[in-house]
Amino acid sequence: MKLNVNPTRMELTKLKKRLTTATRGHKLLKDKQDELMRRFIGMIKKNNELRKDVEKELEGSFKDFLMASAVMSPEFLEEAVAYPKESISVDVKKQNIMSVNVPVFDFKRKLEGDKGSIFPYGFANTSAELDGAIEKLYGILPKLLELAKVEKACQLMADEIEKTRRRVNALEYMTIPQLEETIKFIQMKLDENERSTVTRLMKIKSMMEEKQSNMV
């Protein structure tokens, strides 16, 4: 559907400039969409690998906790993990990837106490299974934070891909065709007007020549 504009040469010039800009914008957005998709696929692959690793390690830790709960009384188990020996602070920054602000987690871990042990208990009344569970959880934290970062990045990039896709489609299937159709229409009208003008001038010339001929 063409735009509702006056079929003038000035309007034609404006529309041609708009078409050039729209075509250039479409190419840039399409390139951005392709690059976003390439990075998104890489992020999804990384996310799946991280998730598998995290789930596997969490499963191992939970199994050790179950084994520990089987050989320890609930009171001793609860007391053993009631006072964590580690404090964690997380600083959230942002990294710009193709106009997408992806979160970056910078976390600092500090063990309490002089010995710097990760275990919040003595070993007299605890089991080796509980030690293993605590050790696994301690080691899995960096992967958990990385997984949170990657999953959030995937979500944000998916949103940006969808927004870019809508803009690409709007240009490709609406704006550019409208401009092309309108330019074609105006050009046709201008050509018609030019032909009419030429025909009228030729007719006037013929009439003037005929008048001069009759006067001789």
Swiss-Prot record:
Keywords: ATP synthesis, Hydrogen ion transport, Ion transport, Transport. GO terms for molecular function: ATP binding; proton-transporting ATP synthase activity, rotational mechanism; proton-transporting ATPase activity, rotational mechanism. One of its GO terms (biological process) is proton motive force-driven plasma membrane ATP synthesis. Pfam families: ATP-synt_D (PF01813). It comes from the Bacteria. PANTHER family: V-TYPE ATP SYNTHASE SUBUNIT D. Belongs to the V-ATPase D subunit family. Produces ATP from ADP in the presence of a proton gradient across the membrane. This is V-type ATP synthase subunit D. The gene is atpD.
